[in-house]
Each structure stands twice: as structure tokens, then as C-alpha cells.
Amino acid sequence: MTDRYILAVESSCDETSVAILKNDNVLLTNIIASQVESHKRFGGVVPEVASRHHVEVITTCFDDALKEAQLEASDLTAVAVTYGPGLVGALLVGLAAAKAFAWANDLPLIPVNHMAGHLMAAREQGELEYPLMALLVSGGHTELVYVTEPGEYHIVGETRDDAVGEAYDKVGRVMGLPYPAGREIDQLAHQGTDTYHFPRAMMKEDHLEFSFSGLKSAFINLHHNAQQKGEELVLEDLCASFQAAVLDILLAKTKKALKQYPSKMLVVAGGVAANQGLRERLAEEITDIAVVIPPLRLCGDNAGMIALAAVVEYEKGHVAGLDLNAKPSLAFDSFHQQ
């Protein structure tokens, strides 16, 4: 059998990435050019800055990926690209590069949903069993997705306001922690105790919706009031208390989803899936079903996950024309509707 090589491009936010996947799940290379240092001084991602950085490095990422994989463009089978959701300017840079490369080398173009990429990153560890439940947690999304078969995604629950990663970054900013704050809050939480009481919105309700705005506001109010009164708060305990509330909500809703939807495994993916506290709670509390979490190198935004998702789309015959456009608000239920 002839080997299949898919080159994938990811540029939906602040990471420029090009990867090459061999056959079903062998990542030959996963080049990532991060912009985190450029955005730190702003306390978050600045869309215009992100787009400019993508333009500066994307050609080099293509060259480095082919060189590291020891392949020529003529060896490739297809090109995959994230077309949404994400920042429109950032998406357009990756799309333009992928379409130009596909056209120049007469290769089919595979459109990939960024969140499907996060979910399908779990494929690197082996074939997934369906139906499965997925908890997707990142800076822009918090979703429970029921996957009935490869490529068939159904959102069964999502946040009504802030995404969990967004909440981490906002409370981190209040505490004066550098962006992105998730990793540092996780580390500090392991050094503290759950001392301060924070609300756990809708945790006991049967539906699968999330809400983190109340928790975020309660945290900000506690911190502000303490400053006004000259009271000293213990940073480690603040982080431990905040993270305990977040994880209580995530675990409660995930358990409800598993009861409501027959599933053979649970996939937890997205940038927040790198959180050590979340991984520990999952291992402790969900023991009657296989829990699959991508390795740390595939939790953040990267083209490797886009390539892993592209295999499913390619095998279903989902290819796009060169008129494929960015869809910054793309949802799973609008997937394939180019």
C-alpha cells in the first residue's frame, strides 16, 4: 500500500503551525511558531499582531516541515487547513498559504474545524471507539460533544458565557500573573488549599450547559474588596479555590453527559486539557470508562491535530474548492457546509 502524507496548516489564533502526518496517525513533524511572548505585554492575544506574525513565519514553517519530514511536495497526498473557528485575520493567513500550496502542487484541499482538530488529537494514541463523549476545554470554547461515528459531531452542552480558559486568563490578570495564566494557576493551586468559597453555577442542574462568568466575577470581587480593606489574600489558596470550583463544574457536567449518552470512551482535549489538576480529578473520579487525553504537545493549538482530524474528512471524501473562506464562528453543527 502506498503511504499517505497529509500536510496540515493551523493559524486560528496565536500559533503558526505546519505538520505532516503519515498514514493514519504517525506525525512525522509538527512545526509550531508560538507568539506568546509577543502578546504577553498586552495580557492577551491582539488579532492584528497575531495576523502579522503569521504572515512573517508561515513560509518558513512550510519549509521546515518538509525538511524535517524529509519529503518533497510531490510526495504529499493532500493539504489540510483550519478554516474556523478563530480570529478571521489569522485564519485567512493559513487559508491563503494552504490554498496556494495545494493549487501549486495539484493537491486536494481538506477543510478542518479547529475544535474537531482538538478532539481528534486523541487519535495519535490509537483508534477511538464510538460512540464517545468529548469534553473540549480551551481559551475560546467549553463544549461537551457527542461523537456517534468518525466525523459526526453533536454539541450536547456548552458554556453560556466565558470559556474556561478565558476565565483562567482573566483571574490570572487580576492576580498579576503573566499571560497565559492557566499553567501558573494550576501550579500555584497544587501549593494551596481550597479556602475561599466560590460559586459553582448550574452544577446540580440536569442540563449540560456551563457558566463561568459568575465564578469569575466572584473572584474579581473578592480580590477587589480585599485590596480596598487592606486585607492580604494567600495567592496559592486563591488559585486552589478557583481551580477547585472550575474542576467541580467540569467533572459534574461530564459525569452527567456520560449518564445521558451511552459512550465507549471519554476524550478530554483542548489547551486546558494540559491542566494537571484536571487530569488528576479525571483519573480519580472517572474509572468506569476509558479516558483519553492527548499528550501535552498536542493539547495547545498545533497543526498535528488538524492533520489527525483531516484523515477522517479525507476518508469521507470531504474536500473543498479554492474558494474556501474563513468562518470565524464556525460550529460543529455547521461543519462541512462550505
Curated annotation (Swiss-Prot):
Membership in a protein family: Belongs to the KAE1 / TsaD family.
GO term, biological process aspect, one: tRNA threonylcarbamoyladenosine modification
Signal sequence region: none
Recorded name of the encoding gene: tsaD
Location in the cell: Cytoplasm
Cellular compartments per GO CC: cytoplasm
Source species of the chain: Streptococcus equi subsp. equi (strain 4047)
E.C. number(s) listed in UniProt: 2.3.1.234
Free-text remark on how the cofactor is bound: Binds 1 Fe(2+) ion per subunit.
Positions that bind substrate: L136, V137, S138, G139, G140, D169, G182, D186, N275
Reaction(s) catalysed (UniProt annotation): L-threonylcarbamoyladenylate + adenosine(37) in tRNA = N(6)-L-threonylcarbamoyladenosine(37) in tRNA + AMP + H(+)
Keyword Iron: yes
Protein name: tRNA N6-adenosine threonylcarbamoyltransferase
SUPFAM superfamilies in the cross-refs: Actin-like ATPase domain
GO molecular function, one term: iron ion binding
HAMAP family cross-referenced by the UniProt entry: TsaD
Function: Required for the formation of a threonylcarbamoyl group on adenosine at position 37 (t(6)A37) in tRNAs that read codons beginning with adenine. Is involved in the transfer of the threonylcarbamoyl moiety of threonylcarbamoyl-AMP (TC-AMP) to the N6 group of A37, together with TsaE and TsaB. TsaD likely plays a direct catalytic role in this reaction.
Binding site for Fe cation: H114, H118, D301
